[in-house]
A protein has these predicted regions:
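A compositional/biophysical signature of low hydrophobicity enriched in polar/charged and small residues
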Residues: 1-91
């Protein structure tokens, strides 16, 4: 599984509806509205790097209101949530 973090700058008028539209895209596991230089952070989870390109270029970037994106591929995940699920004994 390939994970990518996508930072998104949006048109101000698109902010109220873009989060839901991003979350509904196939390949998008999570979408967050954030503070700072970017408006949204999207977590993409797909089988391979080609899938990341498909999601970012052909789905995310095609939504109305997207100004620009910045994509980072994850090398490793160190999420506490992931570790807890690995060692869970079902309680």
């Amino acid at each position: 599984m390939t994970h990518a973090i996508v930072l998104i700058e949006a048109e101000p008028a698109a902010l109220p509806t873009l989060g839901g539209a991003l979350a509904d895209l196939d390949g998008v596991a999570e979408a967050y509205s954030v503070t700072g230089d970017w408006d949204f952070v999207v977590i993409v989870r797909v089988p391979d790097v080609d899938g990341v390109a498909e999601v970012v270029r052909n789905r995310v970037a095609q939504l109305d209101g997207i100004r620009r994106t910045h994509t980072m591929l994850a090398f490793e995940a160190f999420s506490r949530h992931d570790l807890e699920s690995l060692f869970s004994i079902g309680t």
